[in-house]
A protein has these predicted regions:
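N-terminal subdomain of nucleotide-sugar transferases
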Residues: 2-57, 62, 67-70, 95-219
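Active-site-proximal region of nucleotide-activated glycan assembly enzymes
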Residues: 117-128, 280-337
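Conserved catalytic-core segment of nucleotide-activated headgroup transferases in glycan assembly
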Residues: 171-183, 309, 320-405, 411
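Conserved active-site histidine-acidic residue motif and adjacent donor-binding/catalytic loop
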Residues: 242-246, 392-395, 409-422, 435-436
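Short acidic alpha-helix that forms the nucleotide-activated donor recognition element
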Residues: 250-254, 414-426, 445
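Acidic donor-binding loop of glycosyltransferase active sites
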Residues: 259-263, 423-435, 448
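Catalytic binding pocket for nucleotide-activated donors in carbohydrate/polymer assembly enzymes
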Residues: 313, 322, 431-485, 489-500
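A charged, aromatic-enriched C-terminal amphipathic alpha-helix characteristic of glycosyltransferases
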Residues: 340, 346, 483-527
Length: 534
């Protein structure tokens, strides 16, 4: 069946028929994606434009499905922005609150995984959609404005810490959560209550969306009433895996109003449940994508640096006062090193110069321009080895397009002891992407210099000393590290010093929170808080 005929056929389906055939439709789209991957760019674009045109005649919920396919396959921001606008403009009667929330998470997750999907207006559109959803859920709960528990009634020693997902200690956001709770309790003397709202990538009421992703959820945590971390014990609650649930939200609001914490700390953002609770006590949001403001309607935020020009329209859409954004360096906590590997044990060249490329979304984050740069280096230096660690399922495709690079490639897959592996490397090399901050911090700790473009979490964590302008400069910088032992030694020392700063949560987070607490107490609006030089 030709594509045009296929689209015409499914456009005649009502919702029930569409969902009955949903698995077959997804399978057909997956096969189409494989075919498109073999075509020239011009042919691929023409077919996607045909699909986009036909989608314009479909019901809006179906149009979202087809545009999501175009977005993920094209890897261009134009389809992202069209898809977001379609969701924003969709009437509530056709695409309801739960379905729009699912779309918000699916699009946001795709953009985070593949930086090529992000356009100039993408973050602003996501913020507008998030604010729309926040207002809708507030309306459903009868909340019409902030109604804080009076300051004199709030318990100055009690803090509620909310997050949308709690997994194991290999999960960087969970480590961030526990590290911040440790500082609050051990160094600031707070009693801490952790609540997993389970709002991450909500699947409740999800509509058709291509290659739908799901969040991890550990049901066994529902049986726990406390969590232990580095010798400290924290009260713990986990919501059932049916969020957003209005009854659960009401129960959490009641808990806030009864126990009256001095404030609420939201780790991660994009959590409507936390933001609703933040209508009753002050809320401070700490994003885990720390190089940009978090998607949160909470009154206050901590950001790694000052809001940039691109952040201001996002804050405006969210209804957040830019003067209430406080600066604090984002810090990390590592899983302790348990092993001491040799290069031979890892299959790494004993006398090679090892480039480490690390991440859980490398299939989306690694693009041809990055591979071409590595291929040029492989052509110039016989002793270079490129080691991929994490998840890169398509790594073997390197051999068809980059034969020189392929001969210098090693794929380690998932590693439980990242610090032990980094100890066998020489240089951390970062592709263009949003995330990766935790892995570069681990590399710096082991004395590996980094080389990164001036964008995303890796750039924010590594700092100015390790940034390059573009991939051409990255190529020259890598060669310099290989050829200039003195330069490498100096940069390695700077890497270790930077890592010390990135591990000092007590100073960075603790001092910023302490100052922010004073601002909340006296009701000040303007925040000129900075715990480092930007």
């Amino acid at each position: 069946m030709e594509l045009g005929t296929f689209i015409e056929q499914i456009c005649r389906y009502d919702r029930q028929e569409y969902f009955e055939c949903y698995g077959q439709i997804e399978e057909r789209l997956h096969n189409l994606e494989k075919i498109l991957g073999t075509l020239e760019e011009s042919q691929r674009s023409m077919i996607l434009e045909q699909m986009e045109h036909q989608a314009g005649e479909a019901p809006v919920w179906m149009r979202i499905h087809l545009l999501s396919f175009c977005m993920k396959v094209s890897r261009t921001p134009a389809y992202t922005q069209e898809l977001l606008q379609t969701v924003l403009d969709a009437d509530w009667s056709e695409v309801g609150e739960y379905e729009k929330l699912s779309d918000y998470w699916q699009i946001g997750t795709a953009v985070f995984a593949d930086a090529r999907l992000k356009g100039e207006r993408t973050q602003e559109q996501l913020a507008a959609l998030y604010r729309m959803l926040f207002d809708a859920f507030c309306g459903a709960l009868g909340i019409r404005g902030r109604n804080y528990v009076p300051a004199e009634e709030r318990d100055g020693n009690l803090v509620f810490v909310m997050t949308s997902q709690v997994l194991g200690q290999n999960h960087a956001p969970t480590k961030t959560l526990l590290d911040r709770c440790l500082v609050l309790k051990k160094y600031l003397g707070k009693k801490v209550v952790i609540i997993n709202t389970a709002m991450q990538i909500s699947g409740k009421g999800a509509g058709p969306f291509y290659d739908l992703c799901e969040a991890g959820y550990l049901p066994e945590l529902c049986n726990l009433d406390h969590i232990e971390f580095q010798g400290e014990v924290f009260e713990f609650h986990q919501c059932a895996n049916d969020m957003p649930n209005l009854d659960t939200m009401v129960q959490l609001v009641q808990m806030i109003r009864e126990r009256k914490p001095c404030y609420l700390l939201d780790i991660g953002g994009s959590d409507i449940c936390a933001d609703i609770c933040g209508m009753f006590v002050p809320e401070i949001t700490v994003g885990t994508v720390f190089s940009a403001v978090a998607m949160s309607c909470g009154e206050y935020q901590l950001l790694d640096g000052k809001p940039g020009n691109g952040d201001l329209p996002v804050l405006e859409r969210l209804g957040v006062d830019a003067e209430k954004i406080a600066a604090a360096r984002f810090t990390f906590v590592f899983k302790p090193q348990e092993h001491h590997y040799t290069r031979q044990e890892l299959g790494i060249w004993e006398h090679g110069f090892v480039l480490m490329i690390v991440g859980w979304r490398l299939d989306w984050e690694i693009a041809d321009d990055f591979l071409a740069m590595l291929d040029r280096i492989a052509a110039q230096r016989e002793n270079v080895q490129v080691v991929f660690m994490g998840r890169y399922e398509s790594w073997q495709s390197i051999q068809t397009g980059y034969e020189r690079l392929w001969k210098h490639t090693r794929y380690l897959g998932k590693q439980e002891d990242a610090l032990a592996v980094f100890a066998c490397g020489d240089l951390y090399v970062n592709p263009r992407r949003a995330g990766g901050g935790s892995s570069v911090a681990e590399a710096l700790y082991q004395g590996l210099p980094a080389v990164t473009l001036p964008e995303g979490d890796v750039s924010a964590a590594a700092g100015e000393a390790f940034r390059v302008r573009d991939y051409e400069q990255m190529e020259r910088e890598i060669l310099r590290y290989m050829d200039d032992a003195g330069y490498y030694s100096r940069q390695s020392a700077r890497a270790r010093e930077r890592a010390k700063e990135l591990l000092d949560s007590r100073k960075s987070f603790g001092e910023a929170i302490g100052k922010l607490e004073e601002k909340i107490k006296d009701g000040s609006v303007a925040l000129s808080i900075s715990c480092f030089d930007t």
